[in-house]
UniProtKB/Swiss-Prot annotation:
Keywords: Cytoplasm, Pentose shunt, Schiff base, Transferase. This is Probable transaldolase. One of its GO terms (biological process) is pentose-phosphate shunt. Transaldolase is important for the balance of metabolites in the pentose-phosphate pathway. Its main location: cytoplasm. It comes from the Bacteria.
Length: 218
């Protein structure tokens, strides 16, 4: 399973890259706005920081506007992936862009049939939103299971990129399901490192070593 970081914060990306555990980055207009950075410059900076796919989202909602923005964004770096909303106009744009060799990530996917349409159009990735589905009393993990099964049944090459990850249990369940990629906020990634028994074990080892050091005069 590949791990992407869902952020536009360069310091967070640098820390995660240094850990050696992330394979790409996803952004959206909200994350970019939060950083108060020029959009294209920040995307280029992210591409220079992580050597993997970097999703950058269009803001146009019409076919012509999305295709134009996508072509411009794709010119920024070979690793840029264009995030396109799950709408009829968006799927039409995905079909055009995929025929041009431009990688796409269909975002705001909340049903398996939406994911099916995205795959039919040639999307490189589909992003089902786990946490947001859970918020309306549905089962976000079941959604991913259905998408993974459908793609396997019909041999689609589209990658399932699970998004809207709220906590480490989401990551565990998605890994068990066999999802291709999980993109998560930095705070969730940090939590994956920690377990209370690990912390207690380290504390005990250090205490035992200190007692040994005192007893031997080291």
């Amino acid at each position: 399973m590949r791990i992407f970081l869902d952020t536009a914060n360069i310091e967070e990306i640098k820390k995660a890259v240094a850990w050696g555990v992330i394979d790409g980055v996803t952004t959206n207009p909200t994350l970019i706005a939060r950083e108060k950075a020029p959009f294209t410059e920040r995307i280029k900076e992210i591409c220079e920081t992580v050597k993997g796919p970097v999703s950058a989202e269009v803001v146009a909602l019409d076919y012509e506007g999305m295709v134009k923005e996508a072509r411009d964004l794709a010119m920024l770096d070979e690793h840029v992936v264009i995030k396109i909303p799950m709408t009829p106009e968006g799927i039409k744009a995905v079909k055009t862009l995929s025929s041009e060799g431009i990688k796409t990530n269909v975002t705001l996917v909340f049903s398996a049939v939406q994911a099916l349409l995205a795959a039919k159009a040639g999307a490189t990735y589909v992003s089902p939103f786990i946490g947001r589905v859970d918020d309306i009393s549905s089962d976000g993990l079941r959604l991913v299971e259905d998408i993974v099964a459908i793609f396997s049944n019909y041999g689609f090459q589209t990658n399932v990129l699970a998004a809207s990850i709220r906590h480490p249990m989401h990551v565990l369940e998605l890994a068990t399901i066999g999802v291709d990629i999980v993109t998560m906020p930095f705070n969730v990634l940090e939590k994956l490192f920690h377990h209370p028994l690990t912390d207690k074990g380290i504390e005990r080892f250090l205490n035992d070593w200190e007692e040994y050091r005192k007893g031997t005069g080291l």
